[in-house]
Amino acid sequence: DVPASIDWREYGYVTEVKD
């Protein structure tokens, strides 16, 4: 599970909500 609350700008990539 990927937390939708993750700020992808902090990580440098887009995190989509996947199960």
UniProtKB/Swiss-Prot annotation:
UniProt-recorded Gene Ontology molecular function terms: cysteine-type endopeptidase activity
Catalytic activity field: Specificity close to that of papain. As compared to cathepsin B, cathepsin L exhibits higher activity toward protein substrates, but has little activity on Z-Arg-Arg-NHMec, and no peptidyl-dipeptidase activity
Disulfide bonds: none
Keyword presence, Protease: yes
Keywords on record: Disulfide bond, Hydrolase, Lysosome, Protease, Thiol protease
Any one GO CC term of the record: lysosome
An individual GO BP term: proteolysis
Compartmental location: Lysosome
Chief place where the protein resides: other
Enzyme Commission identifier(s): 3.4.22.15
Record-stated family: Belongs to the peptidase C1 family.
Assembly, per entry: Dimer of a heavy and a light chain linked by disulfide bonds.
Free-text function comment from the UniProt entry: Thiol protease.
The protein's name in its UniProt record: Putative cathepsin L3
